[in-house]
Amino acid sequence: MSDVIIPFLTSAVTAFIVAYLLDRWYIKRRR
């Protein structure tokens, strides 16, 4: 069970961080 949950959490956290950084970069660039 953990074999499925751990990669899922890792990918979810990575996607969240990437989306956060892209959002900040996009707002920063528009200004």
UniProtKB/Swiss-Prot annotation:
It comes from the Viruses. This is Putative gene 37 protein. It comes from Bacillus phage SP01.
